[in-house]
């Protein structure tokens, strides 16, 4: 039997609530990217379904994705839908094991089958394009000039709906492959926090990290109650480490103290 094509399944879920509140899936979709010859990736299977979350949809979530309780009343449940996310199309003996999403931690909290390998197009984007105006998938869609259709194999493509967002994320992922980011590197990037180019919250939103006072990073790491996104904590701690080392190098202290501080910073994840 021939080896199956290498497939990365880009998934997206719409939910009954907004993070960090507990929520259930009310719509699921995927768009496959398939590599048949080296680093040439093309679109494969496409699928989308409303999901009965067996719980009411919060009105704030409803205002984002426009999925109502009436729309999902007769839809299949999550337990009925989830196996489809693993099936290779056309259905074969092997299952999909490589998944991608934009902010993959959200999808993984809802769907993380044993043995799954994950790629995060958001973290890839920060790594490849730190100077992008934003790393949200719809912003990247237009910033990158992605040419996407309004209808995908009979499914309408709408922003803030599962298929529309999966389709955009798949386009972003394909561009990331084209620009030379290897799948193995993507997997490593997804498994670790990334250094954010700027924060998008609080009094210093949008500023360069170099323009933010040290006290703000100290507040994030030591004094605030959070909970913080791991990337935010990693960024704040990394900036503090760099600034402390810089101050030590400028101060007339014992060189062994500087070396010890550098070694301590290098040991941190």
List each model region and its residues.
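Generic helix-packing signal
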Residues: 65, 129, 145, 170-174, ...
